[in-house]
Amino acid sequence: MESHIVLIILSGLVIVSYLLDIFAKKTKIPSVLLLLFVGIGIRETLDYLSIPVFDLLKILPSLGTIGLILIVFEGALELDYKREKNKLIFSSFMAALVILLITVLAVALLIQYYTQLPFQLCLINATPFGVMSSAMAIPSVASLSSEKKEFVIYETSFSDVIGIVLFNFFMTNQVIEAQSFIDLGIETVAILIISAIFCLFLLYLIGKITYHIKFFLIIAILIMVYGVAKIFHLPSLVIILAFGLFLNNAEQIVYKPFRKYFLYPTLQEDLQLMHTFSAESSFILRTFFFVIFGFTMHIRDLMDLEMLKFGGLIMIAIYVIRFVYLKFVARIDLNPILFVTPRGLICILLYFSLPPEMRTPTVSTGLLFMIILATSFVMMYGIMKAKKEKV
């Protein structure tokens, strides 16, 4: 394919994504869901015309990881910390932790019932289905009240972090024993210390850079640190979340030496520019990731009745567990928080991180696709329902 044709296609996808984003904001249909359908439509058209296609599955993990970093960073930059929000933060953290753990356990039991495979293997395969997608949830809740929006941002970001930690924990501990939890504790303390040092270093660096190109450098450092932390199996997404929160709330710190050496006059201006940069960059990456994921899917996979039955049981588990926790434990307004539990980018990334020999027969890309579509439609229904009641 000639280079100018490729340029036309890529720029056309960005324009279409921009228009779909505007359409999504007016209709409350998740924009990423529309992008999936664009990818499916392109694939079906090419298959119909018998045009050969490229295998794009190999670039999905890298593209998705960079997109995830930017989306979590963008979401963290929107969070203003105040002491009175401690209850909200704790509530969202506990919701993310408890719901994820129980959902993973329930899905693992379903997988074991269907496959009779070892429970440890079933847990690893179940983990992707327990993790909420901040990439899909955060852009979809822009119209909610500030408290509900912040709850979703915190919960989905915590869910991403905990899900990755849990997945790595299962992958690196074939036999779970006391030492496994000690190692996890050490890793958690290590990442918190690294996050604190890293936040101070980057804020100092931003203040000292006088060259007009600085934000690409900061994002590149974020991505590099994320990658290095992943090599050592550390929950690297914590660094991204911590830096975004720290940057947006640095001016609230009253410690005089900190204000003297780290704060600078144009911090708020740089913060606004960085937020714009991360938002536009995540928009581009989200566009290509979900279009490519839709492109790699085969719509005929959804015709498998056994897969639909199994997927239906997973859906029931997801929403029953969420309802019980939010209603009787967290005791928060269910509308529309109950419905905002989409699966998406993290789910896909974790699934493709599984070595082929560790994937169970029941967990396939078709099942993944079905759960992503179904949870997206449920979220869309919940947000549209909340909008009507608000009117």
Across the structure, where does each feature detected by a protein language model lie?
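Transmembrane helical cores of multi-pass secondary ion antiporters/exchangers
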Residues: M1-V391
